[in-house]
Swiss-Prot record:
Assembly notes: Homodimer.
UniProt-recorded name of the protein: Thiol:disulfide interchange protein DsbC
Gene3D superfamilies assigned to the protein according to its UniProt record, in alphabetical order: Disulphide bond isomerase, DsbC/G, N-terminal, Glutaredoxin
UniProtKB keywords: Disulfide bond, Periplasm, Redox-active center, Signal
Function recorded in the entry: Required for disulfide bond formation in some periplasmic proteins. Acts by transferring its disulfide bond to other proteins and is reduced in the process. DsbC is reoxidized by a yet uncharacterized protein. Also acts as a disulfide isomerase.
PROSITE patterns on file: THIOREDOXIN_1 (PS00194), THIOREDOXIN_2 (PS51352)
GO CC annotation: periplasmic space
Residues annotated as signal peptide: 1-21
Length: 238
């Protein structure tokens, strides 16, 4: 029994050494490209790793010599599936406590919306919140100031996310009320950065539960039909 434990320990050390060696080559390449803060994760492609950067998702060979820019699609099913966004769902889950949520009484679908309080179609979506909720659609908001993190919209949304009643503050802002300055540990910069990784180009940007991103506004009934069809597609294998 002791021999087995020793052999297992040696094997574990050997494998971890290989993993460190692979990551070392990758990190050396990333450092050379000015991507020191990038996060390296496993990839669904053999011999490659996923790299999460401030500007998007990349894929790099384990020897650090070849680099591809995402997204990556699985085309083995009936329709292409964005594998990259499946990976990003982990980061989305980590922000659950920071989301401003409008929960449906009889929930059938959950969508996460990257929003901007200065966006016309974001206002239109929010004005119909009762209709979305009545159909069984729960809406979760993350902040995505289209003009960047130095914009006034970013400062206002940061304040909204820092008050005790975020829903009330968000409702007021969407009605055109002035936003009172507030500060806290919550950083909507993390929301914005995740939006960049998801490839968000404008708002509203809707993320489905499997990581699929649907750009733009959709009326409640059309949204419900799309969500039902998407769910049925996933059940049938894509």
């Amino acid at each position: 029994m002791k021999k087995r434990v020793v052999l297992f320990s040696l094997l574990t050390l050997a494998l971890s050494g290989v993993a460190r060696a692979d990551d070392a080559a990758i990190k050396q390449t990333l450092n050379r490209l000015g991507l020191q803060s990038a996060e390296v994760k496993d990839s669904p492609i053999g011999g490659m790793k996923t790299v999460l950067t401030e500007n998007g998702v990349l894929y790099i060979t384990e020897d650090g010599k070849h680099l591809l820019q995402g997204p990556l699609y699985d085309v083995s099913g009936k329709t292409p599936v964005n594998v990259t966004n499946h990976i990003l769902n982990e980061r989305l889950d980590a922000l659950k406590d920071q989301m401003i949520v409008y929960k449906a009484p009889q929930e059938k679908h959950v969508i996460t919306v990257f929003t901007d309080i200065t966006c016309g179609y974001c206002h239109k979506l929010h004005e119909q919140m009762k209709d979305y909720n009545a159909l069984g659609i729960t809406v979760r908001y993350l902040a995505y100031p289209r003009q960047g993190m130095n914009s006034q919209a970013a400062k206002d949304m940061q304040s909204i996310w820092c008050v005790a009643d975020r829903n009330k503050a968000f409702d007021a802002a969407m009605k055109g009320d002035d936003v009172s300055p507030a500060t806290c540990k919550t950083d909507i910069g993390a929301h914005y950065q995740l939006g960049v990784l998801f490839g968000v180009q404008g708002t509203p940007a809707i993320v489905l539960d499997d990581g699929t991103v649907v750009p733009g506004y959709q009326p409640p009934k059309e949204m419900m039909a799309m969500l039902d069809a998407h769910k049925a597609s996933l059940k049938s294998g894509g």
